[in-house]
Amino acid sequence: GTGAPTQGANGSTDVKIMVGGVEKVIYLPAKLADQLGYFKDQGLNVQILTEPAGATAENSLIAGDVHGVVGFYDHTIDLQTKGKCITSVVQMADVPGEVEVVATSKADAIKSPADFKGKKLGFTSPGSSTDFLTQYLATKNGVATSEYTGVKAGAGTTFISALDNNGIDAGMTTDPTVAQLLDTKKAKILLDMRTVQGTQAALGGLYPASSLYMDCAFVEQHKDVVQKLANAFVKTLGYVNTHSAQEIAAQMPKDFAGGNMDLYVKSINDSKGMFNTDGKMKADGAKNVLEVLSQFSPNVKGKKDNIDLSKTYTTEFVTKVQ
């Protein structure tokens, strides 16, 4: 695994964090914390790497290439079934921030997940959280996973072109892709999981998603580093909560706007309500994630009672944030 974080030249600590798609608004706090200088304030030199597929990001953590991942909490439960102890140390959102969009041309044929039968449904990659959630939505609405075709569609331009070229009829994605699709009228919203209300309607409860998760052994051995990361992330959540989408967009790298600042601001505005302010996991949210996964995830199915949820997240660090 990754050894101890190394000491930088100026006495700062080098930390590598992999983000499951750094330009996604659902993971905005990672790059924003960096841009605001909050990591440096904590004496951390954080290198932010990006890997658009969450399933691949978790592999780099297990392989020890990075110290932490900014990704979906559900991976911690999934990985526990494979004998890995991974824990969320900062829980940034109580909802997924995902949207199920349907191609405008197919909107009359797909009015709810019950209409998924025989359709091509996009997600980022197999084994990703969007794959999990798509399976759940189908199953919950009477469509077996064998009755639709799952398509690896990525995010951003790859997702949009899949929709354009009839590669998918509907799919799950996040802002800024959602804002782009609505702006060009290429897609309509079927289910909106950017809000608590929309998430409860779609998933029957909260579904805590965006988090900073790390290897349990690393967390035990480097509590000081984890505390500093928690300090920076929670401070960033506070910033998101107290600043406008315009102010937030202005702090981000220019290329994140993809040449359309107004649309980027809109995408932040449409999604920023998903973030909590304290980085704390809600226990009933964690329980609902397990509930959802245990219904169809091949890894979790039948093992629900063996999962120790207390090992999948901790509030130890966020409660001590100054």
Predicted regions and their residues:
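Short, glycine-/small- and polar/acidic-enriched structural segments
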Residues: 3-153, 165-175, 186, 190-193
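Soluble non-cytosolic domains of exported or imported proteins
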Residues: 24, 51-55, 124, 128-129, ...
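Flexible glycine/proline-enriched surface loops and loop-helix/loop-strand junctions
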Residues: 115-119, 164, 211, 232-235, ...
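Pocket-lining segment of extracytoplasmic ligand-binding domains
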Residues: 158-253
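Conserved C-terminal helix/tail region of periplasmic/extracytoplasmic solute-binding proteins
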Residues: 287-322
